[in-house]
C-alpha cells in the first residue's frame, strides 16, 4: 500500500497543499522551519490521529483556524482507498474512509503501517520502558487481529482496578476485576513474547550490519516474575498495591531490554550509534511485517543526515531501497539525498509552508 496523493489544509504552517507522490522515494528539502517536517507529520497524523511533535491540538492547527483537514489516496495491489481525517480545536475527530464517516482512527492505522525515524526517536532506546512497549505493541496491532480490542480492555480494567484499590479493604473485593483482567494479561503477554522471539534474529542480523563492532542482545521482560502465575502475583501483592493505589505488576510494566556487549545501550553507544540502532530496529520491524503479512510500511525519516556520516547514510539508503517500500525523507539540502534519488523518485522543495516539485 502506498500513498499516491496527499491533501493538507491548515496543518502547522501549511495553508494548503496537494501532492502527487511517488510509490518509491519522496524527498522534502528546505531550511529549518520551512515546513518539511510538517509534511511528514501530516502523513503520520493521517495514519495515527495525532501528531508526533505535539499532543496539543492547538499547536497543530494553523494559526487562527478552527480545524485541520487531511486527505489521502492509498493504492494497493487490487484497489484504491480514499481516507480522510479532520480534527478541530476541541480535539474532536472525523475519520472518513471511501466516502463514509463514522470510522475509527485504528482503521487508518491498520491501513497505513508506518515506521517513524526522527532526531527525537532516541527515546526508543534511552527513554522509559513505555517506548519499547509501544514498539512491541505496534507489531502486535498489525499482526494480531484481536490485539487492539484486548489492549483497550486491558487499559480500561487496569484503570478501574486502580480506582478500586483506593476503596477496598480485602482482596476478595477485587476479584471481579481480576477475573476479567487475568486472561487479557496472559493473552497480551503471550503475543508480545511470541513477537519478541520471532523478530529477535531479524533484529540481531540487521543490527550487525549497522553496528558490527557490538554484540547486541534483546530480552523481553513481561512485567512480573518468571514462572509465576499472574493471578498469584495479584493476590500476593494486594496490600502493597493498595498502599501504592495502583497495580505494580503486569504487562503495563513490560520492557524489551536491549544491551550492547552486556551493558545497556544508552550507557554504551554514542548518539550516532544510537541512531543507527534505532534505524536498524525500525527496518527490522518493517521487514518482518512484510515477510509475515505481505504488507509494506511507509517509512518517514526526518532530518536524514543528522548524526550519520556518508557511509552510514549510504547503508541506510540501500536498506530502505531494498524494502521496496514508500519512503518520505526530509533534509536541509538536496546534496544529502541526491545519491538516493532515481527515475521514480520525487523531490519537493518546501519554503514557508509552500511546497513545489
From Swiss-Prot:
Positions with a binding annotation for ATP: 30-37
Disulfide linkage: none
Pfam families for this protein: SMC_N
Lineage, opening ranks: Bacteria, Pseudomonadati, Pseudomonadota, Gammaproteobacteria, Enterobacterales
Name assigned to this protein: DNA replication and repair protein RecF
Keywords noted in UniProt: ATP-binding, Cytoplasm, DNA damage, DNA repair, DNA replication, DNA-binding, Nucleotide-binding, SOS response
Subcellular localization: Cytoplasm
Organism the protein comes from: Shigella boydii serotype 4 (strain Sb227)
Classification via SUPFAM superfamilies: P-loop containing nucleoside triphosphate hydrolases
GO cellular component, one term: cytoplasm
Similarity field: Belongs to the RecF family.
InterPro entries per record: DNA-binding_RecF, DNA-binding_RecF_CS, P-loop_NTPase, RecF/RecN/SMC_N, RecF_2
Record's function text: The RecF protein is involved in DNA metabolism; it is required for DNA replication and normal SOS inducibility. RecF binds preferentially to single-stranded, linear DNA. It also seems to bind ATP.
Amino acid at each position: 500500500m502506498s500513498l499516491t496523493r496527499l491533501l493538507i489544509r491548515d496543518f502547522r504552517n501549511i495553508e494548503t497543499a496537494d501532492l502527487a507522490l511517488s510509490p518509491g522515494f519522496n524527498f522534502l528539502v528546505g531550511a529549518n522551519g520551512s515546513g518539511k517536517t510538517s509534511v511528514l507529520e501530516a502523513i503520520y497524523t493521517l495514519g495515527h490521529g495525532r501528531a508526533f511533535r505535539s499532543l496539543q491540538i492547538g499547536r497543530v492547527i494553523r494559526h487562527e483556524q478552527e480545524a485541520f483537514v487531511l486527505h489521502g489516496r492509498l493504492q494497493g495491489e487490487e484497489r484504491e482507498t480514499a481516507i480522510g481525517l479532520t480534527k478541530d480545536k476541541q480535539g474532536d475527530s472525523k475519520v472518513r474512509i471511501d466516502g463514509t464517516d463514522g470510522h475509527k482512527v485504528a482503521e487508518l492505522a491498520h491501513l497505513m503501517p508506518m515506521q517513524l525515524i526522527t532526531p527525537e526517536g532516541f527515546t526508543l532506546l534511552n527513554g522509559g520502558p513505555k517506548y519499547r512497549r509501544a514498539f512491541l505493541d505496534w507489531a502486535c496491532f498489525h499482526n494480531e487481529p484481536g490485539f487492539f480490542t484486548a489492549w483497550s480492555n486491558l487499559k480500561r480494567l487496569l484503570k478501574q482496578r486502580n480506582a478500586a484499590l483506593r476503596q477496598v479493604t480485602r482482596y476478595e473485593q477485587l476479584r471481579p476485576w481480576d477475573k476479567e483482567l487475568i486472561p487479557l494479561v496472559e493473552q497480551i503477554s503471550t503475543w508480545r513474547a511470541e513477537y519478541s522471539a520471532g523478530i529477535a534474529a531479524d533484529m540481531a542480523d540487521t543490527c550487525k550490519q549497522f553496528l558490527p563492532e557490538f554484540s547486541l542482545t534483546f530480552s523481553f521482560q513481561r512485567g512480573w516474575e518468571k514462572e509465576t502465575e499472574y493471578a498469584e502475583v495479584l493476590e500476593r501483592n494486594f496490600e502493597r498495591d493498595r498502599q501504592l493505589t495502583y497495580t505494580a505488576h503486569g504487562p503495563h510494566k513490560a520492557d524489551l531490554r536491549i544491551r550492547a556487549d552486556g551493558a545497556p545501550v544508552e550507557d554504551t553507544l554514542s548518539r550516532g550509534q544510537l541512531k543507527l540502532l534505532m534505524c536498524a530496529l525500525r527496518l527490522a520491524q518493517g521487514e518482518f511485517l512484510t515477510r509475515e503479512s505481505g504488507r509494506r510500511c511507509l517509512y518517514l525519516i526526518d532530518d536524514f543526515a543528522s548524526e550519520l556520516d556518508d557511509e552510514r547514510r549510504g547503508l541506510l539508503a540501500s536498506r530502505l531501497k531494498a524494502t521496496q517500500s514508500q519512503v518520505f525523507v526530509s533534509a536541509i539540502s538536496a546534496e544529502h539525498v541526491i545519491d538516493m534519488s532515481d527515475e521514480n523518485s520525487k523531490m519537493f522543495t518546501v519554503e514557508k509552508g509552500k511546497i513545489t516539485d
